């Protein structure tokens, strides 16, 4: 009886911990304005990964002209997924994803950090995160 009660309590604690981690991980979900106010990106969750789609661009009708895939160059930037495959890593940090830069058509490894004020620090990099640059999304 004691063993059953102990296992039940242990299972309950594990479920509560997992629920708390999911709530923390989902804090990134929302709409953000990119640095300089050029575009808006909405981040959502699909399965266990977080992705971001461009939903507004300051220049209406802008096409993905720098995309290395020829067939994508005539498609509009609005509606394009530019953040892909992020997973919650630790407190206020999501990594393991990629960011597409429509200004040069390149895709980079990326890490996202949620600041206390709700802004995101988005760091795109090649190889290791030391070799990259930050941008702040509000």
Q: Where are these predicted regions, by residue range?
A:
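Bacterial N-terminal signal peptides
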Residues: 7-15
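Structural recognition of beta-strand segments within beta-rich domains
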Residues: 33-34, 129
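N-terminal helix-cap/turn-to-beta initiation motif at the start of protein domains
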Residues: 20-31
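Positively charged n-region of N-terminal signal peptides that target proteins for export
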Residues: 1-4
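Central antiparallel beta-sheet cores of small beta-barrel/beta-sandwich binding domains
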Residues: 29, 35-103, 107-109
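Short polar/acidic secondary-structure junctions
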Residues: 102, 113, 126-128
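Structural motif
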Residues: 46, 115-116
């Amino acid at each position: 009886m004691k063993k059953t009660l102990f296992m039940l309590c242990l299972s309950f604690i594990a479920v509560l911990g997992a629920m708390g981690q999911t709530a923390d991980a989902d804090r990134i979900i929302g709409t953000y304005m990119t640095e300089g106010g050029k575009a808006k990106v909405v981040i959502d969750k699909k399965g266990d990964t977080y992705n971001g789609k461009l939903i507004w661009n300051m220049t209406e009708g802008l096409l993905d002209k720098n995309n290395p895939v020829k067939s994508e160059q005539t498609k509009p930037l609005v509606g394009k997924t530019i953040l892909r495959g992020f997973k919650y890593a630790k407190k206020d940090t999501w990594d393991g994803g990629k960011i597409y830069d429509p200004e040069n058509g390149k895709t980079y490894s990326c890490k996202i950090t949620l600041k206390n004020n709700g802004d995101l620090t988005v760091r795109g990099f090649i190889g290791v995160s030391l070799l990259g640059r930050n941008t702040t999304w509000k």
